[in-house]
Amino acid sequence: MNLKKWHDVEDLEQRFGRMTVAMFLKAFRESEGLSQIEYARKLGLSRANLCDLEKGRKLISPERAAKLAKQIGVPEKVLIQLAIQDTLQSARLKYTVELKTAS
C-alpha cells in the first residue's frame, strides 16, 4: 500500500477501502522502509505497543492520534478522524466521521 500521494481519509479510503489507525500506521511505516523497532523509537513507543497499535489490538484517543500525527508528519485531522472512527466501529455504532476545523 503506497501512501505517498493522498490528501485526506476519504482519498485513502477511495484508493484502499476502509482505513483504520492500525492499517495507516503499518502502511506508513512500511512506505518509509522502517522496521517496527525503528518506527517505535521514532514515536517514543515500545515495539510491543506499536505492534498492538498496528494489529488493532489497542485503540488510541484523539489526543494521542494528534500527537502521533505530528511525530510522523501527517495532518492531525487524518489520524484523529481514523481514531474516532475506530472507536465507533469498536462500539458497533454505525456512523461515519467527517472532521472540519473549528473556527
Model regions and ranges:
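The alpha-helix within a helix-turn-helix
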Residues: 29, 40, 69
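Residue-level detection of the helix-turn-helix DNA-binding "recognition helix"
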Residues: 30, 44, 55-57, 84
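Alpha-helix N-cap/N′ positions at the starts of helices
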Residues: 17-21, 45, 60
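Short Asp/Glu-rich motifs
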Residues: 48, 59, 88
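Short, basic-rich loop-to-helix N-cap that marks the start of a DNA-contacting helix
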Residues: 57-70
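N-terminal flexible/basic segments that precede or flank functional cores
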Residues: 1-23, 27, 31-32, 72-81, ...
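Helix-turn-helix DNA-binding elements, focusing on the entry/boundary residues of the two helices
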Residues: 25, 36, 47, 62-65
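Short alpha-helical DNA-recognition segment
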Residues: 33-52
